[in-house]
Structures are given as structure tokens and as C-alpha cells.
Amino acid sequence: MVVNAQAVDNRAGTLAAGGTITAKASNALNNDGGLVEAGGHLDMQADSLSNAGGRLRALGSGGESRFAIGTALNNDGGVLEVASAALTFDTPALSNRGGVVRHLGSAGLNLDMDLLGQAGGEFITNSAVSLSAEEWVNNSLLQAASILSLIHI
């Protein structure tokens, strides 16, 4: 399923597809209290994405689920659950207070360490996680099923 729009409003709604869901919004993508579920992976591109109290799910185990968000991704109280091999966040701001990011894949959770530390909530992955930064203040729970390394540069 491909959705191209200026804005996408799925508040308390449902978007579901047996394969990949690609959503491109030049403005906001709002899934507050809603459900977006792909049988494949998720490719979400928007200026902002709000999933407060919502659920974003990618059930397929192959490929990469990607969240390329221009300004901010809000997953406060939400669940972002991805079985895709890789999960990548490309956003300058991430809020996950009371939220859960669960990655079941094994090819990597890609997230800027500064975003992870300040986001809050839980980040759980079956993948290895390697983090590097000059300084890190952690307000999140991070659980990795594989080797977890923290490198001070």
C-alpha cells in the first residue's frame, strides 16, 4: 500500500496491508490512537509523525522498516513493533515517554544515541546494538538480545 499526501490523519483509525506500507506526507502523519499494520515492512516519511497511544506494526521479517521524519517523531504511550530485519530512525527529535519500541529483527537497530537517551520509554531489540558518543544521559530503558557495546569517543 502506498499513501502519498500532504497530510495523513489516521487518528483512531486503521490502515492495514498484507505487504509493505509506504506513507509519504509532506506535512504531518498522525496515528494517535490508531493502528497501522503491514504484513511486510513500514516506510514512513513525513515532516512529523505522531503515534501517541497508537500502534505501528511491521510483521514481515525481511527488509528494513524506516522512519524518515523531518522534525519530530512522537511515540508517547504508543507501541512501535517491527519484525523487519533492520529498523532505522532518521529524525532530529524523538519522544517515547511511556512508549515501547520493540524490534524483533536481527540486522540492526539504527538510532542516534542522543535521541535514544532523551526519548524515554523502552527500546527492546533482538539485534546487537553499538552506541558511541562523547557523553550520554540515559532516560530510556534499552534491552538488546545480542552484544551491547557503549563506546566513549
Regions found by a protein language model. Name each.
Residues M1, A16-I21, V36-L42, L59-E64, ...:
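Short "repeat-start/strand-capping" segments in structured domains, especially the N-termini
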Residues M1-V2, F67-T71:
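Extended, compositionally biased low-complexity polar/Lys-Gly-rich tracts
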Residues Q6-V8, S26-A28, D47-N51, G70-A72, ...:
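Hydrophobic lipid-interacting interfaces of membrane-associated proteins
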Residues R11-A16, N31-E37, A52-L59, D76-E81, ...:
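Short, T/G/N/S-enriched strand-turn elements that build extracellular solenoid repeat scaffolds
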Residues N27, L42, S48, S65-R66, ...:
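GD-rich hexapeptide-repeat beta-solenoids
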Residues I151-I153:
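Conserved small/polar residues in nucleotide/adenosyl-binding loops
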